From Swiss-Prot:
Part of the mRNA localization machinery that restricts accumulation of certain proteins to the bud and in the daughter cell. Recruited to specific mRNAs including the ASH1 mRNA, coding for a repressor of the HO endonuclease, via its interaction with SHE3. The keyword Disulfide bond does not apply. It comes from Saccharomyces cerevisiae (strain ATCC 204508 / S288c) (Baker's yeast). Transmembrane segments: none annotated. This is Myosin-4. The gene is MYO4.
Length: 1471
C-alpha cells in the first residue's frame, strides 16, 4: 500500500466505526515509517510501522479510500478498494441521498428508511422495471424480482428470493412488495386471463394482513416484527400464468403468547379484536380492554403510535373473507382467541406444596364456555399430572409454578394449532392439489421471509433455533457466491487460484450432528425427570474439549449457560426453559378434554392437527440410546427435531432453485427517518454476510471492465500515436482493441498478476482501479495545465495591450481631475472648520444649560423633602391633639346623647297630639263634603283605609312607648340625682300625654264604627252611586269647571292629610324604634322613617287596590295553596323558578301601588313559610328540597336591589324616597333571612350526608385505608356528582354554586380537625400520610369546579403535615412553627401529645418541644385542647357578595293554576 502525502484513507473510530482522514506526513528514518493523519473531526493521529504490506500485524494502519467517482456506486463490487469502511461509506452516502437500495454483487442491500416512500412501489415503478435487465436501472427490489421472473421464464428453472435481516430492518415489507410485483406480472393479453389474475393477485396479497395479524408483534426493535419464518411459493404454469400459491411456516414464537417483555406486545390479532369487534359480540365473548388481561398487559402501553386497531381489524377480516373464511368461521376463531385471553386470567391458589383451582373460578368458566369444554376436567389437569407406568397410572399434584406452566402450555398449544390450521386453510384456497396431477404447475418462485440473526442479553431456545437457521442460510450463501465467482472465471477462461473463505460447518455440526446439541436436547427432553441443569452438564462434558471447543465454550461463572461461536458473533444462551420449550406438549388429560369439545371450529382445528401428525412421518433414529426405554422413542418428535427437519427441507428446496438475495439493514435503533448509525450498520453487515461476500470477492478479481469501457476510460494513459487511430475507428477488429488494452496495461501496471484478460472483460485485483484512476487523474491534470497555460497566455497578452491603451487615455483625465479635486477639497475643508466651530459652541452652551437645570431640580427636590418632613411632623402633632380632644370629649358627648334622647321622646308625644287634632278637623270637613256629594264616596273610602293604617301605626307606637319607658327606667338608676329629677319631670309630662293618646284611641274607635256604617250605606246606595258615576263620566266629557275644581280640591286636601300624618307619626315612631334597637345616634344623623303606605292616587286602579288590600286572601293562597304544595321531585327546567316568580309578581304590584305595609307583611309570611318548609324537610329530601328553595329564595334580594335601582334612576318625590327606603330594608332583611335559612340547612344537610356516606370515617378511619377505601370514595364521589347535578338542575347561579362548595369544605375542615384530635386514639406519620392522601383525593374532585380549594381545608391539611414531618429537636420545630399559621399552639400541642411512634425504632416527640408549647400556651392564655367550634355566623360568609346577577331569569312564565287571586292581580296590574 502507498501512503503518500495527500492520500485519502479511513481510520478506526470508536463512535463512528470509521472516520475519513488524509495523510499529512510520511517520513522514513531508522527503518521505521512515521505517518501523520489529520482526521475529519480535526484530530491528528501519529502512526509508526515497519511495513505497509501486512495489515494483520499492524491493525492500527489506515485503510485506503476510493476515489470520489466510485464512492456512491450502485454496486459495491465495483469499488476499487473493497474494504469495510468503503462498503459502509458507499451505503451511507446512497442512503443519505434517498437511495435505500445498493447492489453487492448478487446481493441487494436494502436500508430501512423508516419513512413513507410509496413512490418507490407504485404501479408505474412496477412497469418501469418490468422486462428490464438488472443493471439497466437503479438498484431496486423490483429489479431482483424481475431477474428471478426472467430466469424462470427463459431458463425454465425454479427461483427463490431470500429476504433476511434483523428485526425492524424491513423484511416483511420487502417480501410484501415482491409478492405484489409477482402477482402483478401478466404475460397473457386475453381478458379471461386478466380476470383470473386479478382474483389470484387479491388472494395472494390478502395473505399478508392475515399472517401479520396472527404472526407479527411489537418488539423493542420493531413495531411489526415477524415472529415466525415464512416461505411463500407462487406457482406458474407453462404460459407463466399464476396458478396458485403455497405457504410454509417455520418456528412460530409460542412463548410470546404468554409472556411479553416491557414495551413489547402480544400478537396483533388480540388487540385488533379487543378494539374492532362490535360491542354486542364483545359482550358475548366477555371482552373488555387489553389492560384487563394477563396475556396483553405485561408489556405496558398496549397502543402503537399511528396504528388504528379497529381499522386493522377490518383489513384482517376482509382478508379472511377473501381467502374463503366466512363470517361464522371468523367468529369461531375470535371465540377461541377470547378463550385464550380468559385462560391467561385464571387464578390459582397456592398452598405450601400444591396448587388448587376451583372449577367455579370465573375466568375458567368463561374460557371453557367459549372453547366448549368441561370446566371440571380442564381445571383438574391444570393442577395435576399423570405418570403412566407399565402397570398403572399415577396422578400427582403440581406445585404453583408447575401449574402456571401447565396453564400457559395449554394456551400455547391452542394458539399454535390455530395458526397451523389457518395456514392450511389459506393453502387450500390458494392452491388446488389437482393442479399437480394435471401438470398445470410448471415452475414456481419462492419468497423466504425469515428471521435474522438475533443476539440479546438473555438468549433462549427461540434464539438458538433462529441462529441455527441463519448458520445454514449463511453456509448456502457463501457456497453460492463462491460458485458464481468460479463460473465467471471459467467462462472468461482466465487463470485463477482457489479462494479460501470462512466455513461455518463446525458450528453447524455442533448443532445438528447425531451427538450434537439438538440430539442431546431431544434425549434429555424424552426423560421424565429431564431438566435444564442436567442437559447443561451433558453439554459441558460432551463439547468443552477439542475439537468442538473451537465453537463451543463454557462461561467463566455459572452452570446454566453455554456459548456458541456463530459466524457473526459469539452468543451466550441460558439453558432455562430449553427442555420445556423443546417438549412443546400438553398433558394427555387436556388432550382428552379438548377432544370432547362442542365448539365446531375448535374441533376442526384439533382434527387438522391429527391430520398433520398422520401426514408427517416419524423421525427414525436408529442410533441406540443407553438407559432409554424403547417406548420413549416412539413418542411424538420434539420441537427441535421438527425444526431441524423442516429446515433441512427448506435448504433442499433452496438448493434446487436459483437463489436471489436481499439483505435488509436497520440503519438506527430509534426508528428515526433517514438517520444512519455506523456502528449498528457495521454489525448487521457482518451478521448478514455482506462483508464476507466482499472478502471472497477481494480474494479473486473483484473489479471487471469490458474492453470498450476500458478503452474509453483509460486511452489517455498511452501516447497519442497509439490511440489516435483506434479511438475514432468504429470498424476496428476485436484483436486490435485487445492489443491496445494490453498496451495500456503494460504502460501502467508492472505486475501482470494484478490483472487478467478474459474473453470479454479485463479482471483486476483489489485496488487496481483506484491506481488507474489516480494515473488518469494525473494525466488529465497535466493536459489541463498545458491547455490552461496556452489559453491564459493569449488572454493576458490581449488584456495587456488593451490596458496600456486605456492607461494613456485615462492619465490626462485623471491629472485634470486631481487638480479639481484638490481645489474642491481645500474649499470644503475651510467650510467644515467654520461649521465645526459653530456646532461645538452650540453643544457646549446646551450642555451648560442642561447641567444648570439638573442642579436646580436637585436643589428643589432636597428642599421639598425637608419641607415635607417638617409638615408631616406638624400634622402628627395636630393628629395627636385631635385624638386627645376626642377622647376627652367622649364623656360629655355621652351625657349629651342621654339628654337628647329624652327630649326626642317628649317631642314625639307633642307631635302626636298636634297630628290628632289636625286629623279631627280634616275628617269633619271630609264627612261634610261626602254628605253633600254622594258621588265622592270612593274618595271617602280611601280615607277610611288610611285610618286603618293609622290605627296600626298608633298601636305600634303605643308598644314602642311602653318599651322605651321601661328602658328609661332602667337607665335612670345610672344617672346622677340632679339629672334624674329632670328625667322624672319629663316622664311625668309624658305620662300625661299618654293618657291623652288613650282618649284619642277611643275617638279613633268611634271613627271605625262610623266607617262600618258608611260601608252599609254604600251597599244600600250602590245603584245611586252607579248612576252618579255615569253622570260624572258625561260631565267629565263636557268638562264643567265647577265640579272638576271641587273634585281636585278634595283630592288635594286628602293628600295633604296623608302627608301630615305620615310625616308626624313616621318621625315619632322611627325615633322610638331607633332608640330601642340602636340607642341614640350622633347629632345630625338621618332618622330612619317609619314604614307607611304611599298610595298614588293618580295611577291607582280601584279594583286592583281592593284586591291588594285583602292581604289575608292572597297571602294564604300563596303560602298554603301553592308554596306548601310544591312537589320538588316533579320540578323540571321550565318551572324551577315558579315560586319566586309568584312572590316577586305580588310584591312588585304592592310596591308599585304604594302598599308597603301589605308588602312587608306578605314577605314576612312567605319567608316564614319557606323557612318552615326547609326546616321540616325529611332527611331523604334535604338536598333536593333545600337547594330548590334556596335557588328561589336567593333571587329575592336581587329582585329588591333591581327595583331599588329602577326607583333611584327615576328620581321622584317623597313617596319614591319612602319606597327606596323600604326596598333597601327589604333587600337587607331578606339577605339576613336567607343567610339564616342557608346556614341552618347546610348544617342539617352536612350532618345527614356525613351519616349517610360516612365522610369522616372514610377520611380518618385507619381500618378503611387497607380495606374498602376505594369503594367508599367511589360512593362519596357519586354523592358529590349527584349534589353538583342537583345544583345545576335547579339553576343555582355560579357564584352561589361556588359558595355552597366552599362552605361545604369549611364544614368538612372543622369536623375532620375536631374528630382528628378527639376521636383518634393515637397518631403517627403513617396515619398522617394516609389521611393526607385521602384529603388529596377529596381536593382532586373539587379543584376542577372551584378555585382555592386548599384554603378551605387549611387546618386539617396543616394537621396531617405536622404528623408527617420528622422533628428531632426544638430548633427544627421553631423553624417550622411559623408555617403552621392556621393552628394555634394549643391545637399543635393536642396533635403532638397524641403522636405515637409507628415503628419500634422510631423516636417520639421530644419533651423539649412539648415544654416549649406549654410555655407558649401559658404565656398567651390559650385554652386546651384547642378544639375549633362550628360557628356558622363566623365560618360562613354572607350571601350578599354572591347574589349579584341579572334578575331576568325570575320573570319567566310560571304556572299560576289554583292561584285565582294572584292571577287576577297579575291581570289587573298589566292593565
Amino acid at each position: 500500500m502507498s501512503f503518500e502525502v495527500g492520500t485519502k484513507c479511513w481510520y478506526p473510530h470508536k463512535e463512528q466505526g470509521w472516520i475519513g482522514g488524509e495523510v499529512t506526513k510520511n517520513d522514513f528514518f531508522e527503518g521505521t515509517f512515521h505517518l501523520e493523519l489529520k482526521l475529519e473531526d480535526g484530530e491528528t493521529v501519529s502512526i509508526e510501522t515497519n511495513s505497509f504490506e501486512n495489515d494483520d500485524d499492524h491493525p492500527t494502519l489506515p485503510v485506503l479510500r476510493n476515489p470520489p467517482i466510485l464512492e456512491s456506486t450502485d454496486d459495491l463490487t465495483t469499488l476499487s478498494y473493497l474494504n469495510e469502511p468503503a462498503v459502509l461509506h458507499a451505503i451511507k452516502k446512497r442512503y443519505m441521498n434517498g437511495q435505500i437500495y445498493t447492489y453487492s454483487g448478487i446481493v441487494l442491500i436494502a436500508a430501512n428508511p423508516f419513512d413513507k416512500v410509496d413512490h418507490l412501489y407504485s404501479r408505474e415503478m412496477i412497469q418501469n422495471y418490468s422486462s428490464k435487465r438488472k443493471d439497466e436501472l437503479e438498484p431496486h427490489l423490483f429489479a431482483i424480482a424481475e431477474e428471478a421472473y426472467r430466469f424462470m421464464v427463459h431458463e425454465k428453472a425454479n427461483q427463490t428470493v431470500v429476504v433476511s435481516g434483523e428485526s425492524g430492518a424491513g423484511k416483511t415489507v420487502s417480501a410484501k412488495y415482491i409478492m405484489r410485483y409477482f402477482a402483478s406480472v401478466q404475460e397473457s393479453n386475453n381478458r379471461e386471463g386478466e380476470v383470473e389474475m386479478s382474483q389470484i393477485e387479491s388472494q395472494i396479497l390478502a395473505t399478508n394482513p392475515i399472517m401479520e395479524a396472527f404472526g407479527n408483534a411489537k418488539t423493542t426493535r420493531n413495531d411489526n416484527s415477524s415472529r415466525f419464518g415464512k416461505y411463500l411459493q407462487i406457482l406458474f404454469d407453462e404460459n407463466t400464468t399464476i396458478r396458485g400459491s403455497k405457504i410454509r411456516t417455520y418456528l412460530l414464537e409460542k412463548s410470546r403468547l404468554v409472556y411479553q417483555p416491557e414495551t413489547e406486545r402480544n400478537y396483533h390479532i388480540f388487540y385488533q379484536i379487543l378494539e374492532g369487534l362490535p360491542e354486542p359480540v364483545k359482550q358475548e365473548l366477555h371482552l373488555s380492554s387489553p389492560k384487563d388481561y394477563h396475556y396483553t398487559n405485561q408489556g405496558g402501553q398496549p397502543n402503537i403510535a399511528g396504528i388504528d386497531e379497529a381499522r386493522e381489524y377490518k383489513i384482517t377480516t376482509d382478508a379472511l373473507s377473501l381467502v374463503g373464511i366466512n363470517h361464522e368461521t371468523q367468529l369461531g376463531i375470535f371465540k377461541i382467541l377470547a378463550g385464550l385471553l380468559h385462560i391467561g386470567n385464571i387464578e390459582m391458589k397456592m398452598t405450601r406444596n400444591d396448587a388448587s383451582l376451583s372449577s367455579e373460578e370465573q375466568n375458567l368458566q368463561i374460557a371453557c364456555e367459549l372453547l366448549g369444554i368441561d370446566p371440571f376436567n380442564f381445571a383438574k389437569w391444570i393442577v395435576k399430572k399423570q405418570i403412566v407406568t407399565r402397570s398403572e397410572k399415577i396422578v400427582t399434584n403440581l406445585n404453583y409454578n408447575q401449574a402456571l406452566i401447565a396453564r400457559d402450555s395449554v394456551a400455547k398449544f391452542i394458539y399454535s394449532t390455530l395458526f397451523d390450521w389457518l395456514v392450511d386453510n389459506i393453502n387450500k384456497t390458494l392452491y388446488d392439489p389437482e393442479l399437480d396431477q394435471q401438470d398445470h404447475v410448471f415452475s414456481f418462485i419462492g419468497i423466504l421471509d425469515i428471521y435474522g440473526f438475533e443476539h440479546f442479553e438473555k438468549n433462549s431456545f427461540e434464539q438458538f433455533c433462529i441462529n441455527y437457521a441463519n448458520e445454514k442460510l449463511q453456509q448456502e450463501f457463501n457456497q453460492h457466491v463462491f460458485k458464481l465467482e468460479q463460473e465467471e472465471y471459467v467462462k472468461e477462461e482466465i487463470e485463477w487460484s482457489f479462494i479460501e473463505f470462512s466455513d461455518n460447518q463446525p458450528c453447524i455440526d455442533l448443532i445438528e450432528n447425531k451427538l450434537g446439541i439438538l440430539s442431546l436436547l431431544d434425549e434429555e427432553s424424552r426423560l421424565p425427570s429431564g431438566s435444564d441443569e442436567s442437559w447443561a452438564s451433558k453439554l459441558y462434558s460432551a463439547f468443552n474439549k477439542p475439537p468442538s471447543n473451537e465453537v463451543f465454550s463454557k462461561p467463566r461463572f455459572g452452570q446454566t449457560k453455554f456459548i456458541v461461536s456463530h459466524y457473526a458473533v459469539d452468543v451466550e444462551y441460558e439453558v432455562e426453559g430449553f427442555i420445556e420449550k423443546n417438549r412443546d406438549s400438553v398433558s394427555l388429560g387436556h388432550l382428552d378434554v379438548f377432544k370432547a369439545t362442542t365448539n365446531p371450529i375448535f374441533k376442526q382445528i384439533l382434527d387438522n392437527r391429527e391430520l398433520r401428525s398422520d401426514d408427517a412421518p416419524e423421525e427414525q433414529n436408529t442410533e441406540k440410546k443407553i438407559m432409554i426405554p424403547a417406548r420413549l422413542s416412539q413418542k411424538k418428535p420434539t420441537l427441535g427435531s421438527m425444526f431441524k427437519k423442516s429446515l433441512g427441507e427448506l435448504m433442499a428446496i433452496i438448493n434446487s432453485t436459483n437463489v436471489h438475495y436481499i439483505r435488509c439493514i436497520k440503519p438506527n435503533s430509534e426508528k428515526k427517518p433517514w438517520e444512519f448509525d455506523n456502528l449498528m450498520v457495521l454489525s448487521q453487515l457482518r451478521a448478514c454476510g455482506v462483508l464476507e461476500t466482499i472478502r471472497i470477492s477481494c480474494a479473486g478479481f473483484p473489479s471487471r471492465w469490458t474492453f470498450d469501457e476500458f478503452v474509453q476510460r483509460y486511452f489517455l494513459l498511452t501516447d497519442y500515436s497509439l490511440w489516435s487511430g483506434i479511438l475514432y475507428n468504429p470498424d476496428l477488429p476485436k484483436e486490435a482493441i485487445v492489443n491496445f488494452c494490453q498496451s495500456i496495461l503494460d504502460a501502467t501496471i508492472s505486475d501482470s498478476a494484478k490483472y487478467q484478460i478474459g474473453n470479454t472483460k479485463i479482471f483486476f485485483k483489489a485496488g487496481m482501479l483506484a491506481f488507474l484512476e489516480k494515473l488518469r487523474t494525473n494525466k488529465m491534470n497535466e493536459i489541463c495545465i498545458i491547455i490552461q497555460k496556452k489559453i491564459r497566455a493569449r488572454y493576458y497578452r490581449l488584456q495587456y495591450l488593451q490596458t496600456m491603451e486605456s492607461i494613456k487615455k485615462c492619465q490626462s483625465q485623471i491629472r485634470s481631475l486631481l487638480v479639481r479635486t484638490r481645489v474642491d477639497h481645500e474649499l470644503k475643508t475651510r467650510a467644515a472648520i467654520l461649521l465645526q466651530t459653530n456646532i461645538r459652541a452650540l453643544w457646549k452652551r446646551e450642555y451648560y444649560r442642561a447641567a444648570i437645570g439638573q442642579i436646580i431640580k436637585l436643589q428643589c427636590t432636597c428642599k421639598r423633602k425637608l419641607i415635607l418632613d417638617s409638615v408631616n411632623r406638624k400634622f402628627m402633632l395636630m393628629a395627636a391633639v385631635i385624638i386627645q380632644s376626642y377622647i376627652r370629649s367622649y364623656g360629655h358627648k355621652t351625657d349629651y346623647r342621654t339628654l337628647k334622647r329624652s327630649s326626642i321622646l317628649v317631642q314625639s308625644a307633642m307631635r302626636m297630639q298636634l297630628a290628632r287634632r289636625r286629623y279631627i278637623v280634616l275628617q269633619k270637613e271630609v264627612e261634610e263634603r261626602n254628605i253633600r256629594a254622594s258621588y265622592g264616596i270612593g274618595l271617602l273610602e280611601e280615607a277610611i283605609e288610611f285610618k286603618n293604617s293609622f290605627i296600626l301605626n298608633l298601636e305600634m307606637l303605643n308598644d314602642s312607648y311602653t318599651r322605651l319607658t321601661q328602658l328609661l327606667q332602667g337607665d335612670l338608676s345610672n344617672i346622677p340625682s340632679k339629672q334624674r329629677q329632670e328625667y322624672e319631670t319629663i316622664v311625668n309630662g309624658y305620662n300625661d300625654k299618654i293618657s291623652k293618646l288613650k282618649t284619642l284611641q277611643v275617638e279613633i274607635m268611634n271613627t271605625l264604627n262610623k266607617k262600618n256604617a258608611l260601608k252599609e250605606r254604600k251597599k244600600k246606595q250602590s245603584s245611586l252611586i252607579q248612576s252618579h258615576m255615569q253622570s260624572l263620566a258625561a260631565i267629565k266629557g263636557n268638562k264643567p269647571s265647577r265640579l272638576s275644581d271641587e273634585v281636585k280640591s278634595m283630592k288635594q286636601e286628602l293628600a295633604f292629610i296623608e302627608n301630615v300624618i305620615a310625616q308626624d307619626f313616621t318621625t315619632t315612631y322611627s325615633a322610638n324604634k331607633n332608640d330601642k334597637v340602636k340607642g341614640l345616634g350622633i347629632a345630625g344623623q338621618q332618622v330612619k322613617p317609619k314604614l307607611v303606605n304611599v298610595i298614588r292616587r293618580e295611577s291607582g286602579n280601584p279594583d286592583l287596590l281592593e284586591l291588594l288590600m285583602d292581604l289575608n286572601c292572597y297571602t294564604l293562597e300563596v303560602t298554603e295553596g301553592y308554596l306548601k304544595k310544591v312537589n320538588v321531585t316533579e320540578v323540571n327546567g321550565d318551572n324551577v323558578l315558579g315560586p319566586i316568580h309568584v312572590i316577586t309578581t305580588v310584591v312588585s304590584s304592592l310596591v308599585r301601588n304604594g302598599l308597603l305595609i301589605q308588602s312587608s307583611k306578605f314577605i314576612s309570611k312567605v319567608l316564614l313559610t319557606v323557612e318552615s318548609i326547609v326546616m321540616s324537610l325529611p332527611k331523604d329530601e334535604t338536598m333536593l328540597g333545600g337547594i330548590f328553595w334556596l335557588s328561589n329564595l336567593s333571587r329575592l334580594p336581587a329582585f329588591a336591589a333591581n327595583q331599588k335601582t329602577l326607583y333611584e334612576a327615576n328620581g321622584g318625590d317623597e313617596k319614591d324616597k319612602l319606597t327606596l327606603i323600604y326596598l333597601n330594608d327589604l333587600e337587607n332583611e331578606t339577605l339576613k333571612v336567607f343567610d339564616k335559612i342557608y346556614s341552618t340547612w347546610l348544617v342539617k344537610f352536612m350532618k345527614h350526608a356525613s351519616a349517610h356516606i360516612e365522610i369522616f370515617d372514610m377520611v380518618l378511619n385507619e381500618k378503611l385505608f387497607k380495606n374498602s377505601g376505594d369503594e367508599k370514595f367511589a360512593k362519596l364521589f357519586t354523592f358529590l356528582n349527584e349534589f353538583d347535578a342537583v345544583l345545576c338542575k335547579f339553576q343555582v347561579v355560579d357564584s352561589m354554586h361556588t359558595k355552597i362548595f366552599n362552605d361545604t369544605l369549611k364544614y368538612l375542615n372543622v369536623m375532620l380537625f375536631n374528630d382528628l384530635i378527639t376521636k383518634c386514639p393515637a397518631l403517627n406519620w403513617k396515619y398522617g400520610y394516609e389521611v393526607d392522601r385521602n384529603i388529596e383525593r377529596l381536593v382532586s374532585w373539587f379543584e376542577p369546579r372551584i378555585e382555592d380549594v386548599r384554603p378551605n381545608l387549611i387546618q386539617i391539611i396543616q394537621a396531617v403535615k405536622i404528623l408527617q414531618l420528622k422533628i428531632s429537636n426544638l430548633n427544627e420545630f421553631k423553624l417550622l412553627f411559623d408555617f403552621w399559621y392556621a393552628l394555634n399552639p394549643a391545637q399543635i400541642q393536642a396533635i403532638l401529645l397524641k403522636y405515637k411512634p409507628a415503628n419500634k425504632g422510631e423516636a417520639g416527640v421530644p419533651n423539649e418541644i412539648l415544654n416549649y408549647l406549654a410555655n407558649v400556651i401559658k404565656r398567651e392564655n390559650l385554652s386546651l385542647p384547642g378544639k375549633m367550634e362550628i360557628m356558622l355566623s363566623a365560618q360562613f360568609d354572607s350571601a350578599k357578595n354572591h347574589l349579584r346577577y341579572d334578575t331576568s331569569a325570575i320573570t319567566q312564565n310560571s304556572n299560576t293554576e289554583g292561584l285565582a287571586t294572584v292571577s287576577k292581580i297579575i291581570k289587573l296590574d298589566r292593565k
